[in-house]
Regions:
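Gly/Ala-rich phosphate-binding loop of Rossmann-like dinucleotide-binding domains
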Residues: 2
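Short beta-strand segments at enzyme active-site cores
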Residues: 5, 10-12, 114-118
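Conserved N-terminal subdomain of the carbohydrate kinase-like
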Residues: 7-88
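Conserved beta-alpha-beta core of the PfkB/ribokinase-like small-molecule kinase fold
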Residues: 90-146
Length: 146
Protein backbone atom coordinates (compact mmCIF):
# COMPACT_ATOMS: atom_id res chain seq x y z
CA UNK A 1 0.00 0.00 0.00
CA UNK A 2 2.80 2.42 0.82
CA UNK A 3 4.25 1.94 -2.66
CA UNK A 4 1.00 3.32 -4.11
CA UNK A 5 1.28 6.43 -1.96
CA UNK A 6 -1.11 5.42 0.82
CA UNK A 7 0.33 6.63 4.15
CA UNK A 8 1.14 3.66 6.38
CA UNK A 9 2.05 3.47 10.06
CA UNK A 10 3.48 0.22 11.35
CA UNK A 11 3.34 -0.33 15.09
CA UNK A 12 5.79 -2.91 16.35
CA UNK A 13 9.09 -3.42 18.09
CA UNK A 14 12.55 -4.59 17.23
CA UNK A 15 15.95 -4.85 18.82
CA UNK A 16 18.82 -2.46 18.34
CA UNK A 17 20.74 -5.04 16.31
CA UNK A 18 21.52 -6.12 12.73
CA UNK A 19 18.12 -7.79 12.23
CA UNK A 20 16.31 -4.73 13.56
CA UNK A 21 18.34 -2.44 11.31
CA UNK A 22 17.49 -4.57 8.25
CA UNK A 23 13.79 -4.38 9.11
CA UNK A 24 13.86 -0.61 9.67
CA UNK A 25 15.84 0.01 6.46
CA UNK A 26 13.37 -2.12 4.46
CA UNK A 27 10.47 -0.15 5.91
CA UNK A 28 12.06 3.22 5.13
CA UNK A 29 13.02 2.09 1.62
CA UNK A 30 9.34 1.22 1.07
CA UNK A 31 8.01 4.50 2.49
CA UNK A 32 6.63 2.97 5.69
CA UNK A 33 6.96 5.20 8.72
CA UNK A 34 9.10 3.79 11.51
CA UNK A 35 7.93 6.45 13.98
CA UNK A 36 5.89 3.86 15.88
CA UNK A 37 8.44 1.05 15.98
CA UNK A 38 9.90 0.63 19.45
CA UNK A 39 13.62 -0.13 19.13
CA UNK A 40 14.54 -1.65 22.46
CA UNK A 41 18.15 -1.33 23.59
CA UNK A 42 18.03 -4.53 25.68
CA UNK A 43 17.04 -7.79 24.04
CA UNK A 44 17.24 -8.87 20.44
CA UNK A 45 14.97 -8.71 17.42
CA UNK A 46 12.80 -11.81 17.24
CA UNK A 47 13.46 -14.11 14.30
CA UNK A 48 11.07 -16.73 12.91
CA UNK A 49 12.23 -19.40 10.50
CA UNK A 50 10.03 -21.72 8.46
CA UNK A 51 11.27 -25.06 7.13
CA UNK A 52 9.27 -27.11 4.64
CA UNK A 53 9.20 -30.89 4.85
CA UNK A 54 8.77 -33.27 1.89
CA UNK A 55 5.02 -32.56 1.87
CA UNK A 56 5.59 -28.79 1.86
CA UNK A 57 4.24 -28.53 5.41
CA UNK A 58 5.97 -25.81 7.39
CA UNK A 59 7.75 -26.30 10.68
CA UNK A 60 8.53 -23.07 12.52
CA UNK A 61 11.35 -22.18 14.84
CA UNK A 62 11.20 -18.95 16.83
CA UNK A 63 14.18 -17.17 18.36
CA UNK A 64 13.39 -14.41 20.81
CA UNK A 65 15.09 -12.52 23.61
CA UNK A 66 12.75 -9.74 24.69
CA UNK A 67 13.46 -7.04 27.27
CA UNK A 68 11.12 -6.48 30.23
CA UNK A 69 9.73 -3.22 28.78
CA UNK A 70 7.78 -3.93 25.60
CA UNK A 71 6.02 -1.86 22.94
CA UNK A 72 7.03 1.44 24.50
CA UNK A 73 5.48 3.69 21.82
CA UNK A 74 3.01 6.53 21.59
CA UNK A 75 0.34 5.47 19.11
CA UNK A 76 -0.52 7.54 16.05
CA UNK A 77 -3.72 9.56 16.29
CA UNK A 78 -6.37 7.59 14.46
CA UNK A 79 -9.15 9.14 12.42
CA UNK A 80 -12.50 7.88 11.22
CA UNK A 81 -12.17 5.21 8.52
CA UNK A 82 -8.47 4.62 9.20
CA UNK A 83 -7.73 0.91 8.99
CA UNK A 84 -6.11 -0.85 11.94
CA UNK A 85 -4.80 -4.35 11.23
CA UNK A 86 -4.09 -6.63 14.19
CA UNK A 87 -3.40 -10.31 14.36
CA UNK A 88 -1.46 -13.38 15.27
CA UNK A 89 -0.13 -14.04 18.77
CA UNK A 90 1.02 -10.43 18.99
CA UNK A 91 -2.62 -9.37 19.45
CA UNK A 92 -3.10 -12.00 22.18
CA UNK A 93 0.15 -11.79 24.10
CA UNK A 94 -0.65 -11.05 27.77
CA UNK A 95 2.54 -8.98 28.08
CA UNK A 96 1.32 -6.62 25.32
CA UNK A 97 -2.43 -6.79 25.99
CA UNK A 98 -2.77 -3.45 27.75
CA UNK A 99 -1.05 -1.65 24.85
CA UNK A 100 -3.11 -3.53 22.24
CA UNK A 101 -6.32 -2.60 24.07
CA UNK A 102 -5.20 1.03 24.14
CA UNK A 103 -5.00 0.95 20.33
CA UNK A 104 -8.30 -0.91 19.95
CA UNK A 105 -10.09 1.49 22.29
CA UNK A 106 -8.80 4.45 20.30
CA UNK A 107 -9.91 2.76 17.07
CA UNK A 108 -13.40 2.23 18.45
CA UNK A 109 -13.63 5.80 19.76
CA UNK A 110 -12.48 7.34 16.47
CA UNK A 111 -14.56 4.94 14.33
CA UNK A 112 -11.53 3.42 12.62
CA UNK A 113 -11.98 0.09 10.85
CA UNK A 114 -10.41 -2.84 12.71
CA UNK A 115 -9.28 -5.80 10.59
CA UNK A 116 -8.47 -8.85 12.72
CA UNK A 117 -6.53 -11.83 11.42
CA UNK A 118 -6.34 -14.37 14.27
CA UNK A 119 -3.69 -16.45 12.44
CA UNK A 120 -3.58 -18.74 15.47
CA UNK A 121 -0.59 -21.07 15.11
CA UNK A 122 -0.35 -24.61 16.39
CA UNK A 123 2.71 -23.59 18.41
CA UNK A 124 0.25 -21.90 20.82
CA UNK A 125 -2.34 -24.69 20.92
CA UNK A 126 -1.55 -25.45 24.58
CA UNK A 127 -2.68 -21.91 25.42
CA UNK A 128 -5.88 -22.00 23.34
CA UNK A 129 -8.31 -22.28 26.27
CA UNK A 130 -6.51 -19.58 28.24
CA UNK A 131 -6.40 -17.24 25.22
CA UNK A 132 -10.01 -17.83 24.11
CA UNK A 133 -11.41 -14.80 26.03
CA UNK A 134 -8.81 -12.54 24.42
CA UNK A 135 -9.59 -13.90 20.95
CA UNK A 136 -13.30 -13.28 21.57
CA UNK A 137 -12.55 -9.76 22.79
CA UNK A 138 -10.53 -9.06 19.62
CA UNK A 139 -13.44 -10.38 17.54
CA UNK A 140 -15.76 -7.96 19.34
CA UNK A 141 -13.52 -5.02 18.41
CA UNK A 142 -13.18 -6.15 14.79
CA UNK A 143 -15.18 -4.84 11.86
CA UNK A 144 -13.57 -7.35 9.51
CA UNK A 145 -12.23 -10.80 10.40
CA UNK A 146 -10.05 -12.83 8.07
Amino acid sequence: MSRTGVPICFISETGNDHVGNIILRFMRDNHISTDYVNVFPDGKSPVSLAFLDDNSDAEYIFYKDYPKQRLDVIYPKLEEDDIVVIGSYYALNPVLREKVLELLDQAREKKAIVYYDPNFRSSHKEEAIKLAPTIIENLEYANIVR
